[in-house]
Amino acid sequence: MSKADVVIVGAGHGGAQCAIALRQNGFEGTITVIGREPEYPYERPPLSKEYFAREKTFDRLYIRPPTFWAEKNIEFKLGTEVTKVDPKAHELTLSNGESYGYGKLVWATGGDPRRLSCQGADLTGIHAVRTREDCDTLMAEVDAGTKNIVVIGGGYIGLEAAAVLSKMGLKVTLLEALPRVLARVAGEDLSTFYQKEHVDHGVDLRTEVMVDSLVGENGKVTGVQLAGGEVIPAEGVIVGIGIVPAVGPLIAAGAAGANGVDVDEYCRTSLPDIYAIGDCAAFACDYAGGNVMRVESVQNANDMGTCVAKAICGDEKPYKAFPWFWSNQYDLKLQTAGINLGFDKTVIRGNPEERSFSVVYLKDGRVVALDCVNMVKDYVQGRKLVEAGATPDLEALADAGKPLKELL
């Protein structure tokens, strides 16, 4: 049976960063990374933006050149999944039937796109935007003449895909079940702004609509039927309704977790010698009032990966990384600092009509998060307000001419 001192399951951002950080921190043992996809680790965010828009080729998405991993003596088993974890034996069962031993295990599998459960969900022409294969398949259909696309889901993935497709000249309809887009992650001001932007760019954006079924001919999707009976023509459908944490084997092995796998302040699961990082890991977040939650971002995956690598190398410290996020749509750059969970007030800096403004989120008078649209200085200075738990004067906070650093 093959084995490694550290086995990392998942070859995304978190898994790659953990392997890199192990070597950077002097780890000399054996490292194996097991990845479901055939590619070496690559950046995910550009998939729904620059890669799909043909602004970046795939070789520019690699986190490190493929030759880097061999140079650092990091082994990869690509196109492979873990189907079973035996924590007592410190042994994995792989999708090819092979057994693989580990000293320490780092679970960095992220999540699988949530699928529609309605009639017609198994038709061809229905896509996620999670992997290179997802995007390549959709791009091939566009190249073959697809003109009408329906995007189901008004989160960041759906909005970013809609922006790219509309810029390419396709007819895009975006459907959101809730009263506004970004309802789970942003305040009403930001939602209203982005809804208007997409409508102004030609997207048929509809909120408070429910999908009843997908209709098709000869096994291929041709439309999306709404609960009221209307059928929206669609030669392709993109589904962006969230992810399901890919933690089945860990939970089956006895790991605690209801939404992903639970980890402590050191990213340790309830199973011995097993860590979890990234989108699949639920932890008590200091920047969300100690609420146990999963944070789906590249920043979180990378920082958790570094935290675990240092712990394995003997420098164990609690995970306290500051959360941040970004999204590019059209010519708009959104930068988010902090987590707005439970906010009770917002303050607007700047003018949304000028397409350059910030939304500051407060809870009990304390700044907990910012959404900054084309406001880089606010983002850089505002994150310090969040880190400090600042309680600024609201009138001064609303004055876009007053630098946020002066409110500390």
Swiss-Prot record:
Cofactor: FAD
EC number, as in UniProt: 1.18.1.3
Superkingdom as given in the UniProt entry: Bacteria
Catalytic activities: 2 reduced [2Fe-2S]-[ferredoxin] + NAD(+) + H(+) = 2 oxidized [2Fe-2S]-[ferredoxin] + NADH
Cellular component aspect of the GO annotation: cytoplasm
InterPro entries referenced in this protein's UniProt entry, alphabetically: FAD-oxidoreductase/Apoptosis (IPR050446), FAD/NAD-bd_sf (IPR036188), FAD/NAD-binding_dom (IPR023753), FAD/NAD-linked_Rdtase_dimer_sf (IPR016156), Reductase_C (IPR028202)
Covalent S-S links between cysteines: none
A GO molecular-function descriptor: ferredoxin-NAD+ reductase activity
Keywords: FAD, Flavoprotein, NAD, Oxidoreductase
Residues noted as binding FAD in the record, renumbered to the chain: G14, K49, V82, R130, D279, V298
Pfam entry (one): Reductase_C
Subunit structure: Monomer. The dicamba O-demethylase multicomponent enzyme system is composed of an oxygenase component (DdmC) and an electron transfer component formed by a ferredoxin reductase (DdmA1) and a ferredoxin (DdmB). In vitro, dicamba O-demethylase assays in which DdmA2 is substituted for DdmA1 demonstrate that the two enzymes possess nearly identical activities.
Function field: Component of the dicamba O-demethylase multicomponent enzyme system involved in the degradation of the herbicide dicamba. In vitro, catalyzes the transfers of electrons from ferredoxin (DdmB) to NADH. Both NADH and NADPH support enzyme activity, with NADH being markedly more effective than NADPH.
Family membership noted in the UniProt record: Belongs to the FAD-dependent oxidoreductase family.
UniProt protein name: Dicamba O-demethylase 1, ferredoxin reductase component
Organism ancestry: Bacteria, Pseudomonadati, Pseudomonadota, Gammaproteobacteria, Lysobacterales
